[in-house]
A protein has these predicted regions:
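Conserved, mostly hydrophobic/aromatic
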Residues: 11, 38, 97, 105, ...
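Mid-to-C-terminal alpha-helical segments outside catalytic/metal-binding sites
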Residues: 1-10, 14, 23-45, 219-221, ...
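Catalytic pocket-lining loop regions of alpha/beta-barrel enzymes
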Residues: 104, 118-223
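Active-site environment of divalent metal-dependent phosphoester hydrolases
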Residues: 15-18, 53-56, 82-85, 112, ...
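Divalent metal-dependent hydrolysis catalytic cores, especially in the metallo-beta-lactamase
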Residues: 12, 32-55, 73-80, 102-104, ...
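Histidine-centered catalytic micro-motifs
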Residues: 7-17, 110, 136-138, 170-173
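Short, acidic/polar
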Residues: 26-37, 84-97, 178
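Active-site neighborhood of phospho(di)ester-bond hydrolases with catalytic His/Asp-centered motifs
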Residues: 7-10, 47-50, 76-78, 106, ...
């Protein structure tokens, strides 16, 4: 049964003060609440991802809070494009993050208000990788504003090409452009597609067929997550069970946790 396969939540956002964007989860987005739901969902591992200015996030203390909650939760730092983005300063920032216990950084173009053609984006990704940090790039590109159109799949394809052999996790995998992002990522074997948000938000739409296809034909390149508190890891468990029904068990394990654990290298605990 696929419900015996533990999950690795690729994108969780528990916050120090339990709050979130707007009033959606005011006071209810705590580490304790997330841990309880993760245990109920048989979710053994999670990337806990901070966002600048949200829920009391502080880079200096977030990693310690994550590690104190569970040895199987791994902190990811928010990368702010403000301030000095010179090579030496980036190296210093990433070294500090690594020394603080972070396993990666999250680049969120909408929140950071940057475009994928930002002149320091490629160096930032490369230097983070050199420091041993995984890079998570948000690919939910839809927002208001005169510059919003500049973040699109053409820009994403160009970015991957400029990076050459990028090691990236593409958060949300392009949402409604899922299959197109799959083909954009296909030539880059170290690019992992994260189905958080997309898996739950578009339930009942034509994307269900695309997700089913990817579980069966692209199972070595995808992972699942909640984007909590937008969606619960319990919702992810239910959706995972739907798509894993009748699936080769090895493919189900790939999607559930193996791909993401391989992507992160040796930082995660054994499957057990």
């Amino acid at each position: 049964m696929s419900d015996n396969i533990p999950l690795f939540d690729s994108l969780a956002h528990p916050t120090p003060d339990g709050n979130w964007l707007g009033s959606k989860a005011a006071g209810r987005n705590s580490f304790g609440q997330y841990l309880r739901e993760a245990e109920e969902a048989n979710c053994r591992w999670a990337l806990c991802v901070g966002l600048g200015g949200v829920g009391g996030y502080d880079e200096g203390s977030y990693a310690e809070l994550v590690r104190a909650t569970s040895p199987h939760f791994y902190p990811v730092a928010y990368f702010d494009f403000g301030g000095d983005l010179g090579e030496r300063e980036l190296e210093r920032r990433f070294r500090r993050m690594k020394d603080s216990g972070y396993v990666g950084i999250k680049i969120h173009p909408r929140i950071a208000q940057v475009q994928l053609d930002h002149p320091r984006l490629v160096p930032a990704i490369q230097l983070a990788a050199e420091a041993g940090l995984a890079v998570v790039l948000c690919t939910h590109f839809y927002s208001a504003g005169a510059e919003a159109y500049r973040n699109n799949l053409t820009a994403l394809s160009r970015l991957l090409g400029e990076l050459g052999d990028p090691k990236l996790m593409l958060a949300h995998a392009g949402t409604v452009r899922l299959l197109e992002v799959m083909e954009i990522a296909r030539p880059y074997p170290r690019v992992l597609l994260d189905l958080s948000e997309t898996l739950c938000k578009y339930e009942g739409s034509s994307l269900d067929l695309d997700i089913q296809f990817m579980f069966r034909k692209f199972d070595r390149r995808i992972c699942v997550g909640s984007d909590s508190p937008e969606y619960s890891i319990l919702d992810v468990r239910r959706r995972f069970e739907e798509f894993a029904r009748g699936l080769d068990p090895e493919k189900a394990v790939n999607v559930a946790h193996r791909n993401l654990r391989n992507f992160l290298g040796g930082v995660t605990s054994p499957a057990g």
